[in-house]
Amino acid sequence: MKRLFLALSTLLCITSVSAGNSEYVNPFIGTSNFGATHPGAQYPNGLASVSPFNVAFGGDTNPTKKDDSWNSRGYIYENGYLTGFSHLNLSGVGCPEAGVLLLMPTAGKLMLEAEKYGSTYSNEQAKPGYYQAFLDKYKIKAEVTSTLRTGLSRFTF
């Protein structure tokens, strides 16, 4: 009887802890009003931090672009035009670290200018360690995550 009680108690404890506090985290907090954070995928103390980059082109969908006055961030919540995903970011400092080498899934003819190859996006979702968005122009679902030593991207065409 004691073993059964111990087994049931252990099972109850494991199931009650499994959800954790991460379900209450909103990665979009701090991505407006010069908060300088990004909603991208980060692993605690990891080497890679994969984040959307939506400040390269102003236009109508991006009211704020990179290097406008004080702005040096790689992501701004109010912007709606994505030009890729950066894998080297420090959230909270207001800049992509070590330069910006963007990974951008596209289809069709190769275009090199950000205002041409970029895309508006929808269905943006973020939770700790995961980010996704749907690239409207190319009809591509982009998902990114990170591990201790690398960032992983999955693009569904």
Task: Cite the ranges covered by each PLM segment.
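Sec-dependent N-terminal signal peptides
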Residues: L4-T15
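Accessory carbohydrate-recognition regions in carbohydrate-active enzymes
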Residues: G20-F157
